[in-house]
């Protein structure tokens, strides 16, 4: 995931939006700087003399950090609280999990997606949150709370949400793609990018053969792996953040990615467009959590509460392009973003969307092993033909 890079005109429009959307400062609010005010009913200074440094580990540049003339919400937090922030990034949920599992490092706040929250909670890797220290939790929309990956939100506070979809270059496709299966079309050999993480890649391939994004057996994992092998010769590269340079630079015809990042890419290259494939997409919630070995639990809860402040949430949502779960922030958004079918799709998309569930250990193990096998597979077959045979085999079984 990557921050949003605005043109000069877009930055000017954003400035107007921020000024016009900002609420009138309440009598008890604290003005941190000209861009950010926070609630005065919270003791932001209680750790000011404790010389605390919070280690924050987030998806790749998934925050408004002062880059490209954005509002720096991290430095504003330091100014407000006296707490220092050591901010580092990772490129996928799997990288986050591996880093924490390896030991030897201690983070105070992390940002896993839904299924990874469930996995980490199950393995005792997360600390229960004290919501008394996170009063802004009350501003999160009910749609994003009490989900199956964290019933009662014992371990997580929603940060952003979004969907997956297919971004494509309108000058490089004969017809606009409408299905995930279009990524298996041999006409686009060496012009298709694919996720370089197993969970997203398996989810897409599953939909092309009529299966759920949440596989129910090792046999289903094997069928999905076969579909990915069928695509292998068509794929130019398996990517994560590399997708930005490739799609913005016109180096590939299509790629699956996250809707919020698609907004970034389209802003950089007007030849790009985005579609939610008709088979159904992933609806995801990225959350803020505290690892079980965090050194500064209460200060971490303060940071989470701060990110839920409306002005801070607005700065983040506007800059990175992802969808906010904070009701007050959505109400403050510019209409172009608030009513964007990419960022805030309607019922026709969400009704068919699936949330990633925490998979059983045997299915996770099979996925990891077969993903590694697939990546080293050299004969990908003939795309659609192999996919059609897979569909027939599943229908017969």
Task: Spell out what each predicted region is.
Residues 127-138, 156, 270-282, 291-294:
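Short beta-strand->loop
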Residues 41-45, 105-111, 127-166, 191:
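A structural signal for short loop-to-beta-strand junctions that line the ligand-binding cleft
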Residues 121-128, 148-154, 234, 265-276, ...:
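Ligand-binding "clamshell"
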Residues 32-119:
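Early extracytoplasmic/lumenal segment of secretory-pathway proteins
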Residues 19-32:
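Sec-dependent signal peptide cleavage junction
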Residues 291-352:
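Mature extracytoplasmic/periplasmic domains
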Residues 348-397:
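Conserved C-terminal helix/tail region of periplasmic/extracytoplasmic solute-binding proteins
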Residues 193-197, 201, 205, 213-277:
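Ligand-binding pocket segment of bilobal, Venus flytrap-like solute-binding proteins
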